[in-house]
């Protein structure tokens, strides 16, 4: 089967952090998320990176391709998804592991090296959603992981 060819992103202004909205006991990766996205009618996984519970970073869409993760921002952003983000009742929960947060820090650091003018944003900064279920700006500034249900 031929690989889907996506439009190349011409500009990178933002890095968006997302969560998979899965429970802490669900260790899913790019394969499962790709399947979920295809079931929604997408051609492929919408994120550029997925960070599993153990901190493993998996590649999704090609880093220079237009993603499908934030309506209105896909052509200017890179999407990073942390696996987890909800509790047993489906409510937002910052249940991410230290390994995930360390990996997120590393991914964002590398992206900043490639795209130094881009800003780090949470999905809930531009959409009425809880995603990524934590206060990203607080974490960036202090390293403190605090649940947020913004949206």
UniProtKB/Swiss-Prot annotation:
Q: What is this protein called?
A: Endolysin
User: GO molecular function of the protein, one example?
Assistant: N-acetylmuramoyl-L-alanine amidase activity
Instruction: Look up keyword Zinc and say if it applies.
Output: yes
Please name the InterPro entries in this protein's record. Answer: Amidase/PGRP_sf (IPR036505), Amidase_domain (IPR002502), Endolysin_T7_type (IPR034689), PGRP (IPR015510), PGRP_domain_met/bac (IPR006619)
Q: What is its EC number?
A: 3.5.1.28
What does the entry give for GO biological process? defense response to bacterium; negative regulation of viral transcription; peptidoglycan catabolic process; viral release from host cell by cytolysis
- Tell me about pH and activity: Optimum pH is 7.
> Family, per the entry?
Belongs to the N-acetylmuramoyl-L-alanine amidase 2 family.
| Compartment(s) where it occurs, according to its Swiss-Prot or TrEMBL record | Host cytoplasm
Superkingdom of origin organism = Viruses
Q: Name one Pfam family in it.
A: Amidase_2
């Amino acid at each position: 089967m031929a690989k889907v060819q996506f439009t190349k992103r011409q500009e990178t202004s933002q890095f968006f952090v997302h969560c998979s909205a899965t429970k802490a006991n669900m260790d899913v990766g790019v394969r499962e998320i790709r399947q979920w996205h295809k079931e929604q009618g997408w051609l492929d996984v919408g994120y550029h990176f997925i960070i599993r519970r153990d901190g493993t970073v998996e590649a999704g869409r090609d880093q220079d391709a237009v993603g499908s993760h934030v309506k209105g921002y896909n052509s200017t952003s890179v999407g990073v998804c942390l696996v987890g983000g909800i509790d047993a009742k489906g409510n937002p929960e910052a249940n991410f592991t230290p390994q995930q947060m360390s990996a997120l820090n590393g991914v964002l650091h590398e992206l900043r090296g490639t795209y130094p003018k881009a800003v780090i944003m949470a999905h809930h900064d531009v959409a009425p959603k809880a995603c990524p279920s934590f206060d990203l700006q607080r974490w960036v500034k202090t390293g403190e992981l605090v649940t947020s249900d913004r949206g």
